[in-house]
Amino acid sequence: MEHLNKKEEICRKVAESFRFAGKITKMSPYGSGHINDTFMLTCELEDGSNKHYILQRMNDDIFRNPKELMENVVNVTTFLRKKIIAAGGDPERETLNIILTKDGASYLQDETGDYWRSYVFIDDATCFDLVEKPEDFYNSAVAFGHFQQLLADYPAATLHETIKNFHNTVDRFHNFLKAVEEDVVGRAKDVQAEIEFVKAREADCHIICDALANGEIPLRVTHNDTKINNVLIDAATGKGICVIDLDTVMPGLSAYDFGDSIRTGANDCAEDEPDQSKVHFDLHLYEVFAKGYLSTAGASMSPAEKKSLAWGAKLMTLECGIRFLTDYLEGDHYFHTARPDHNLDRARTQFTLVRQMEEVFDQMLEIVS
């Protein structure tokens, strides 16, 4: 509790530097995120009503350049706000709104060197951690597709690449080969089947990257963390209203965002399921998501880019499995593990999903065409 009070004390001091409306009457830890320290602030306005804000300490161990990160967030949200207003929407609820410091900056560096930023809290909205019913997955797809559509004419190349080669599957494959060759903890001999599974799909790793290099698909502004809980759902309508957590917004491909949503949402198992007989790729949920995503993003996409979405589903799943297996071979240094072979179980789950996607891949292509 002392540690929590210390955090709140620091947070209160930091809050004095931001342009909040009204007087701060309450401050409490908020959410279950593991990367940033997040607090909700309640401010009482002159008319007696309350306004809520989010105040966050950014984790610069993960995001090494908070300045570039916040430049991306400011530029993208400013662009989105203009688009939403032009379309007659509600910019206070349909995009994140940054609260500036009293010096007019988008973030604050405190006396200890930590970086802080603040957003207006969007009231009367919620989010889901899991796909509980197809309608939820559809609504998240509509929201992510709308996000892509609004940013279709944003100059993606002008954004900072805040995490280098984040979804470069070719680079991930090369890192994997290096881990196999060095075999620093002597595990390679026990996972030959998994190693051969990845090696057999080397050509697949190049497909999306080559399509971009050849000009077949465009560079886009991508979210890069398209889990269902990064869409706020309006409490009254049940519809997705706002895409949140823009820390990984940077140049990328629509296939990345589409594919990561499918990887995390179109199955009925835990990411670290040790029993592979319980792992099932759900083609129906894939179709539900594709329908929602294309209903909003499809108008700005060429046939080649739509086709790349199916490849994105397979390759984001394969890439994630490669990362888990690479970490396992290197001694479990990157991903937190709770048991022996935890990363191996994670890798096997992703590879099982890839196999099942391959069995229905023609249907996956047809659905997005």
Tell where the protein language model's regions lie, with residue ranges.
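Conserved ATP-binding subdomain of kinase catalytic cores across diverse folds
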Residues: 26-30, 34-44, 49-178, 252-254, ...
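Long, compositionally biased intrinsically disordered regions
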Residues: 357-360
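Small/polar glycine-rich anion-binding or flexible loop at a beta-alpha turn
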Residues: 306-316
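ATP-dependent phospho-/nucleotidyl transfer catalytic cores
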Residues: 2, 21, 28-32, 56-57, ...
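Conserved active-site aspartate in kinases
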Residues: 245
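Juxta-kinase regulatory segment immediately upstream of eukaryotic protein kinase catalytic domains
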Residues: 1-28
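Active-site activation/catalytic loop segments of kinase-like enzymes and analogous catalytic loops
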Residues: 255-299, 315-334
